[in-house]
């Protein structure tokens, strides 16, 4: 089993979790192929983290499956935007930590 962790990436954790749930449990090669055609910003980021996790374990993408793909909330950058009558509105720029773990793929008929 190998893992890759990307910290403080500038993407909303809630939006990235939608993509992470789609690829969890998939074969790594199939996940990378499907993420390539998703229009989301998070899809490209998660794709790179999956490729890094596969490379960290010296595996080939077709030999492994994604055992865990987790997106956690990180620090939030706060900015201010001037508004009418001297007031200000807060701009929230969320960041996320993305953790991907890959392990050997189970063969058909093989139990845990």
From Swiss-Prot:
Protein's name in the database: Large ribosomal subunit protein uL22
GO molecular function annotations of the record: rRNA binding; structural constituent of ribosome
Function: This protein binds specifically to 23S rRNA; its binding is stimulated by other ribosomal proteins, e.g. L4, L17, and L20. It is important during the early stages of 50S assembly. It makes multiple contacts with different domains of the 23S rRNA in the assembled 50S subunit and ribosome. The globular domain of the protein is located near the polypeptide exit tunnel on the outside of the subunit, while an extended beta-hairpin is found that lines the wall of the exit tunnel in the center of the 70S ribosome.
Family: Belongs to the universal ribosomal protein uL22 family.
HAMAP family: Ribosomal_uL22_B (MF_01331_B)
Lineage, broadest ranks: Bacteria, Pseudomonadati, Campylobacterota, Epsilonproteobacteria, Campylobacterales
Subunit-structure text: Part of the 50S ribosomal subunit.
Source organism per UniProt: Sulfurovum sp. (strain NBC37-1)
Pfam families: Ribosomal_L22
Keywords: Ribonucleoprotein, Ribosomal protein, RNA-binding, rRNA-binding
NCBIfam families on file: rplV_bact (TIGR01044)
InterPro entries in the cross-refs: Ribosomal_uL22, Ribosomal_uL22_bac/chlpt-type, Ribosomal_uL22_bac/org-type, Ribosomal_uL22_sf
